[in-house]
């Protein structure tokens, strides 16, 4: 089952992956985080937020139970967002130059700003919306 899911997601990303780019302007926007609790470690350059977390950066919206963000020396963030049973992580972002969005849901989502890659782990769902209409979905 995992092999089949990996194959399906890989095929989908190969087919639609080349033109799927997030808004370039999002890279220069500040990240805003709301959560029940938040802790920042200035020495380690890590932020941990827990409890009804909502993070936004430009057109990026992410909702999770917990988020850990690590910042490298160039200021690029690596984010791990986790959900819980019945409450998966949700992510939505606009595609560059189009009236399209992609939405992702999974038990865990990892996002690397440096490579502009996201990784969906556990019960993953990926959707492409044109306007507000569902165009493609893979589970």
What is the predicted role of each segment?
Residues 1-7:
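Bacterial N-terminal signal peptides that target proteins for export
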Residues 2, 19-20:
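Intrinsically disordered, low-complexity regions of eukaryotic proteins
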Residues 7-17:
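Bacterial N-terminal signal peptides
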Residues 21-139:
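N-terminal amphipathic/hydrophobic interface segments
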């Amino acid at each position: 089952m995992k092999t089949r899911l990996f194959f399906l997601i890989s095929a989908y990303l190969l087919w639609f992956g080349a033109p799927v780019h997030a808004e370039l302007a999002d890279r220069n926007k500040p990240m805003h985080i709301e959560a029940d609790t938040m802790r920042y470690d200035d020495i380690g350059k890590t932020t941990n937020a827990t409890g009804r977390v909502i993070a936004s950066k430009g057109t990026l919206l992410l909702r999770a139970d917990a988020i850990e963000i690590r910042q490298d020396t160039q200021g690029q963030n690596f984010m791990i967002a986790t959900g819980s049973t019945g409450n998966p992580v949700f992510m939505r972002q606009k595609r560059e130059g189009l009236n399209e969005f992609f939405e992702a849901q999974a038990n865990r989502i990892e996002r690397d700003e440096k490579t502009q890659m996201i990784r969906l782990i556990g019960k993953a769902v990926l959707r492409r919306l044109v306007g507000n209409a569902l165009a493609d979905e893979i589970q």
